């Protein structure tokens, strides 16, 4: 039963790009994306605060679901739509502060044990990955593949889910066929020969999400 301790999100968040700059946030929101994440790694809060402020402002302008990866204090301070955390961040994050601020929470998982940990936090959505091999970040776990993803989806039933990891334009339809609510993409857009065309095609497949 989907009863999170955080504000709910639609079961289908649609196409969900994960990008590392405000420039990408702006161009993708202009292109019609309505769920997006700013993921900047390994910088101090003061180094990324201006980018977080700018990203959140863009999210409001386009009435989009703008998630901030990791920098939960800044997300609370500047009232982002939501925060996304990795498993390693859950123990060091004040989840009650995020909850009290009314922000949505997404949590990454890589196996059944991590899904248990995520469910205990009762987040707004659960990310499942990595589905395929990915060059975007070093991953200690093995790719899950479509069969394992489908198994996780069956277990999570009505919980909003996001598949991530190595999802290309060519693989997007097969990933969504598992029943997952949304697909997160990185290089499928940012490294595409024509990012506008790739975004438009992915939006055709995954949509912009439910209201």
Swiss-Prot record:
Cofactor(s) listed:
Mg(2+)
> Membrane spanning segments where?
none
Keywords for this protein: Magnesium, Metal-binding, Thiamine biosynthesis, Transferase
**Is Magnesium one of the keywords?**
yes
Could you tell me what reaction this enzyme catalyses? 2-[(2R,5Z)-2-carboxy-4-methylthiazol-5(2H)-ylidene]ethyl phosphate + 4-amino-2-methyl-5-(diphosphooxymethyl)pyrimidine + 2 H(+) = thiamine phosphate + CO2 + diphosphate; 2-(2-carboxy-4-methylthiazol-5-yl)ethyl phosphate + 4-amino-2-methyl-5-(diphosphooxymethyl)pyrimidine + 2 H(+) = thiamine phosphate + CO2 + diphosphate; 4-methyl-5-(2-phosphooxyethyl)-thiazole + 4-amino-2-methyl-5-(diphosphooxymethyl)pyrimidine + H(+) = thiamine phosphate + diphosphate
GO annotation, biological process: thiamine biosynthetic process; thiamine diphosphate biosynthetic process
**InterPro entries, per this entry?**
Aldolase_TIM (IPR013785), ThiamineP_synth_sf (IPR036206), ThiamineP_synth_TenI (IPR022998), TMP_synthase (IPR034291)
Report residues binding 2-[(2R,5Z)-2-carboxy-4-methylthiazol-5(2H)-ylidene]ethyl phosphate. Answer: 134-136, 166, 186-187
GO terms under cellular component? cytoplasm
**What Enzyme Commission number(s) does the record list for this chain?**
2.5.1.3
EC class of this enzyme? transferase
Residues bound to 4-amino-2-methyl-5-(diphosphooxymethyl)pyrimidine: 37-41, 69, 108, 137
| Note on cofactor | Binds 1 Mg(2+) ion per subunit.
Binding-site positions, Mg(2+): 70, 89
Q: In which pathway does it act?
A: Cofactor biosynthesis; thiamine diphosphate biosynthesis; thiamine phosphate from 4-amino-2-methyl-5-diphosphomethylpyrimidine and 4-methyl-5-(2-phosphoethyl)-thiazole: step 1/1
Task: Report the domain of life of the source organism.
Answer: Bacteria
GO terms, molecular function:
magnesium ion binding; thiamine-phosphate diphosphorylase activity
UniProt record similarity statement: Belongs to the thiamine-phosphate synthase family.
Q: Which NCBIfam families match?
A: PRK03512.1 (NF002904), thiE (TIGR00693)
Function, in words: Condenses 4-methyl-5-(beta-hydroxyethyl)thiazole monophosphate (THZ-P) and 2-methyl-4-amino-5-hydroxymethyl pyrimidine pyrophosphate (HMP-PP) to form thiamine monophosphate (TMP).
Please give the name of this protein.
Answer: Thiamine-phosphate synthase
Q: Which organism is it from?
A: Salmonella dublin (strain CT_02021853)
């Amino acid at each position: 039963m989907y009863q999170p301790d955080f504000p709910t999100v639609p079961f289908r968040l649609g196409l969900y790009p994960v990008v590392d700059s405000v420039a990408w946030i702006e161009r993708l929101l202009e292109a019609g994306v309505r769920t997006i994440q700013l993921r900047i790694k390994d910088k101090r809060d003061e180094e990324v605060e201006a980018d977080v402020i700018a990203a959140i402002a863009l999210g409001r302008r386009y009435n989009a679901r703008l998630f901030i990866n990791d920098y939960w204090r800044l997300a609370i301070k500047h009232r982002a739509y939501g925060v996304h955390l990795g498993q390693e961040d859950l123990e060091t994050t004040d989840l009650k502060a995020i909850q009290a601020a009314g922000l949505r929470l997404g949590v990454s998982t890589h196996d059944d044990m991590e899904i248990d940990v995520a469910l205990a936090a009762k987040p707004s959505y659960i990310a499942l990955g990595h589905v395929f091999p990915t060059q975007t970040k070093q991953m200690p776990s093995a790719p899950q593949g479509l069969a394992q993803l489908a198994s996780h989806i069956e277990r999570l039933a009505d919980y909003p889910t996001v598949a991530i990891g190595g999802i290309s334009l060519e693989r997007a339809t097969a990933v969504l066929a598992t029943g997952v609510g949304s697909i997160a993409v990185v290089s499928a857009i940012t490294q595409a020969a024509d990012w506008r065309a790739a975004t438009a095609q992915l939006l055709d497949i995954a949509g912009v999400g439910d209201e």
